[in-house]
Amino acid sequence: MAAMTVQLDIVSAEGGIYSGRVSHLQVTGSEGELGIMHGHAPLISKIKPGMARVTKQDGSEEVFYLSGGILEVQPASTSILADVVLRADDIDEKAAIEAKNRAEAHMVDAGSDFDYQAALIEIAKATAQLRVLETIKKNIAR
C-alpha cells in the first residue's frame, strides 16, 4: 500500500522554498499547533512565527523557520505563503541572539514614543528562530 501523502508548497516573497509530497506537516497556527496529513479537512489559518516540521514521503524530516504567513489546506494540496522562510541550516544563531537581546534592551530603555508591539514581534521572531535551532540540535544528538 502506498504511503498517504499530500502535496506541500512553501512559498515566500522571494519565491518557492519547498515543493514535494509529504506525509505530515506540523506548524503553529493562530490557534495553536496544527498537524496536517492526507485527508485533513480544508482549512485556512494564520501562521505564527515558529517552526514548520515537514515529514517527507521517504520518512526524512526537514525543518523551516516561518516568520508568519498563511496556511491553506485543500483536499489535494497544502500551501504555506510565508513572509520569510529560512531552512534551519540558514538560520544565523548569533544574529538571532543579538536581535533578541537588542529588542529586549530597547524595551527596558524605552521612551514614550517606543513601539512595544514592534519590539515584541522582533523578540518572538528571534525566539522562534532559536527554538528551530534547538530542535535541530536535539534531533542531531539522538
From Swiss-Prot:
**Can you say where in the cell this protein is located?**
Cell inner membrane
Q: What is this protein called?
A: ATP synthase epsilon chain
Which Gene3D superfamilies does the protein's record reference?
ATP synthase delta/epsilon subunit, C-terminal domain, F0F1 ATP synthase delta/epsilon subunit, N-terminal
According to the lineage, what is the superkingdom?
A: Bacteria
Membrane topology value? Peripheral membrane protein
SUPFAM superfamilies, per database record: Epsilon subunit of F1F0-ATP synthase C-terminal domain (SSF46604), Epsilon subunit of F1F0-ATP synthase N-terminal domain (SSF51344)
The UniProt entry, under PANTHER family, shows: ATP SYNTHASE DELTA/EPSILON CHAIN, ATP SYNTHASE EPSILON CHAIN, CHLOROPLASTIC
What is the annotated role of this protein in its UniProt record? Produces ATP from ADP in the presence of a proton gradient across the membrane.
Q: Which Pfam families match?
A: ATP-synt_DE, ATP-synt_DE_N
The GO molecular function terms of this record are: ATP binding; proton-transporting ATP synthase activity, rotational mechanism
User: What GO cellular component entries does it have?
Assistant: plasma membrane; proton-transporting ATP synthase complex
Presence of the UniProt keyword Repressor in the record: no
Q: Which organism encodes this protein?
A: Shewanella denitrificans (strain OS217 / ATCC BAA-1090 / DSM 15013)
The main place the protein resides is membrane
The entry assigns this protein to a family as follows: Belongs to the ATPase epsilon chain family.
Keyword terms: ATP synthesis, Cell inner membrane, Cell membrane, CF(1), Hydrogen ion transport, Ion transport, Membrane, Transport
Q: Which InterPro entries match?
A: ATP_F1_dsu/esu_C_sf, ATP_synth_F1_dsu/esu, ATP_synth_F1_dsu/esu_N, ATP_synth_F1_esu_C, ATPsynth_dsu/esu_N
What is the annotated quaternary arrangement, including any partners?
F-type ATPases have 2 components, CF(1) - the catalytic core - and CF(0) - the membrane proton channel. CF(1) has five subunits: alpha(3), beta(3), gamma(1), delta(1), epsilon(1). CF(0) has three main subunits: a, b and c.
